[in-house]
Amino acid sequence: MMIDRETQVVDCRCGAGLGKGGGLAQRGTLSEAGRAEVVAIAMSPGQRHITKPVCEITYGMRKENIQVSVLVLYSGSGIPESGMRTGSFVLSPVEVAQIEMHKLAVIHLGNIKDHVVRKTREILSQANIPAIVVSQIPVDFEDFAEAGIKTRLVMPRDEDIRTKGIVMDMVSGVTRGDSCPRDKLNLIIKYVKTTLDQLEDHKGVA
């Protein structure tokens, strides 16, 4: 893939796309970048989870010479039950390993705050990785910390921590099925670059 003067190699999926969601492949698939820097995590394409913004976010990061893989979760289209019990939304061991191959995760979620928080907790409870959460509905560090999720600015009490990974930043206002606004894309890229720099300097993550 040629982007301006830079070349990126992407190992694409063997599965065909669903014809919607901006061209992303079917659930349970990974397109892997040449270097394992960032993984964009998308929910399964379907009526509730149209993943169009993920393609634009991925392309925008690649234009900035950020190496991005894309993982479409197998069970990501499930509706969370009360307490996010096993069976409603889980990661497979393969998906956890695929996520942890990378330095940073960008998690694309939706417009129900409880679902955003619970799915973030489920992912980061299994995958030990810093993450940037992209959603339609606004969420903040306190929302995540109250659910036992480690964050860059607000931490739960030690006995309440329920995640291995940590939320570094979040960007709201990215609507499923719509184009990602330019200002939101710029903010995502800014947070990704800042976090990667912090990781390079061994700063900023617990």
Swiss-Prot record:
GO biological process: methanogenesis
Keyword Ubl conjugation: no
Membrane spanning residue stretches: none
Signal peptide positions (record): none
Pfam families: MCR_C
Superkingdom field: Archaea
InterPro entries: Me_CoM_Rdtase_prot-C, Me_CoM_Rdtase_prot-C-like
Keyword set includes Ion transport: no
Keywords: Methanogenesis
Subunit and partners: MCR is composed of three subunits: alpha, beta, and gamma. The function of proteins C and D is not known.
Designated name of the protein: Methyl-coenzyme M reductase operon protein C
Organism of origin: Methanosarcina barkeri (strain Fusaro / DSM 804)
